[in-house]
């Protein structure tokens, strides 16, 4: 099996304030930018052959240099993202689709991942590739630890309580058979329809293919602000 | 204003395996058991006058000794919990209710808290007391960071995606006007009805009193297994 991974990395450029007035362009864990760890996981996943990254125009050179100096040979394209995350993924999908239409060979699966989730393990990525080819679509998730309630009609108060045993928190990488994901994004772009995530998009256009659950632990967190870094460092140390 | 806090601490006795084959009876953070930090927060909250703890029979002496040696003078009773968490809270409520029926004076509010959430701040506890007296009920929560989906009719697949902007993850301490919480628990005990949390119980019997949202950060986590400890240590260090 072979899969292409799309990394949505438009949000990685938030400036990190450090003690002493210094700042860094990228949030770091264990001395490396978050996105470095993310790319390393895909580099080490045996089922992934190519990585496409969508990011802000300002970060393209930075990410290309990082991939080169780290020896991440799977990084094939670093391109500019779009207005919304879905637009960024769509930009990558068009490039994959165009690039492979000549040879007529699409990959078995396409995975879409948040650049800000550095702790996904290579073997988890490989499992998701396998299950998405098998079932059509596969998405990682875990059980919420807290009770979940709706916000009420008065937004300062709670509404109904959801039945927690029926809920999952979902993450990325979300994996799909390549043709299904390309087709779903194509149709969504035509309609101008935006979904919460790629799974919701595929569910809309391929309702007969339920999305397989891949239950992970609690390490696959999303790191977006400096406040997330102490917890991220702890998870990083625990995973080493 | 004055409030009594009920701490549900039946789950604190899980044995923590340490490197080298040693084990400790209680999970620890920063050299103190999780429950020590929890009790300290309530000790330091100016609106809380008394603390009732419900725990396993085996842990009663241990917690009484801990409270005494730490100088936690608000800990009034450490009693045996019941079969379910709700039974444990009900045991404390009956004791509060009986103890105050003679003098005819209930506290303004009763707070119910998970012993395994050590990072609630004293000033947050005081805010929740104030808001629960003002509105009838107040519960802390924060926004889910991940998309939430239902588990499907086939439990290996996802069902519908929930609208994340309408959801809150809820925690404790959950605060209520004393009479409302006592009455709701009394009626639930008569009916034999069990709720997800105390808020759901009060919502059932006092539907005209919507539960106020108190939005917290992401520090108020629940610590239940040794795997939670590295993240907990990181939050502890960041809060110091």
Curated annotation (Swiss-Prot), chains A, B:
Reactions the enzyme catalyzes: 2-C-methyl-D-erythritol 4-phosphate + CTP + H(+) = 4-CDP-2-C-methyl-D-erythritol + diphosphate
Transmembrane segments: none
Pathway: Isoprenoid biosynthesis; isopentenyl diphosphate biosynthesis via DXP pathway; isopentenyl diphosphate from 1-deoxy-D-xylulose 5-phosphate: step 2/6
Enzyme Commission no: 2.7.7.60
Disulfide-linked positions: none
Superkingdom, natural source: Bacteria
PROSITE patterns in alphabetical order: ISPD
Signal peptide range in chain numbering: none
InterPro entries with a match to the protein in the record: IspD (IPR001228), IspD/TarI (IPR034683), IspD/TarI_cytidylyltransf_bact (IPR050088), ISPD_synthase_CS (IPR018294), Nucleotide-diphossugar_trans (IPR029044)
Keyword Nucleotidyltransferase belongs to the record: yes
Keywords: Isoprene biosynthesis, Nucleotidyltransferase, Transferase
Site feature (Transition state stabilizer) residues: 15, 24
Site residues, Positions MEP for the nucleophilic attack: 164, 222
Family according to the record: Belongs to the IspD/TarI cytidylyltransferase family. IspD subfamily.
Name of the protein: 2-C-methyl-D-erythritol 4-phosphate cytidylyltransferase
Organism of provenance: Chlorobium luteolum (strain DSM 273 / BCRC 81028 / 2530)
High-level lineage: Bacteria, Pseudomonadati, Chlorobiota, Chlorobiia, Chlorobiales
């Amino acid at each position: 099996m072979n899969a292409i991974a799309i990394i949505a990395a438009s949000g990685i450029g938030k400036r990190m304030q450090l003690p002493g007035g210094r700042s860094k362009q990228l949030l770091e864990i264990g001395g490396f930018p978050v996105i470095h760890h993310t790319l390393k996981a895909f580099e080490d996943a045996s089922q992934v052959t190519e990585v496409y990254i969508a990011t802000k125009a300002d970060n393209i050179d930075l990410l290309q240099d990082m991939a080169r100096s780290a020896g991440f040979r799977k990084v094939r394209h670093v391109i500019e993202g779009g207005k919304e995350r879905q637009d960024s993924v769509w930009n990558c999908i068009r490039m994959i689709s165009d690039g492979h239409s000549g040879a007529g060979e699409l990959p078995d699966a396409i995975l879409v991942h948040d650049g800000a989730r550095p702790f996904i393990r290579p073997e988890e990525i490989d499992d998701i590739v396998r299950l998405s080819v098998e079932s059509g679509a596969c998405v990682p998730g875990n059980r919420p630890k807290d009770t979940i309630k709706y916000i009420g009609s008065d937004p300062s108060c709670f509404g109904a309580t959801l039945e927690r045993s029926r809920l999952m928190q979902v993450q990325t990488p979300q994996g799909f058979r390549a043709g299904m994901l390309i087709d779903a994004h194509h149709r969504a772009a035509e309609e101008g329809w935006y979904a919460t995530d790629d799974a919701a998009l595929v569910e809309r256009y391929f309702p007969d293919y339920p999305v397989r659950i891949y239950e992970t632990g609690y390490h696959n967190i999303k790191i977006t602000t400096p406040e997330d870094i102490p917890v991220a460092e702890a998870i990083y140390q625990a995973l080493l």
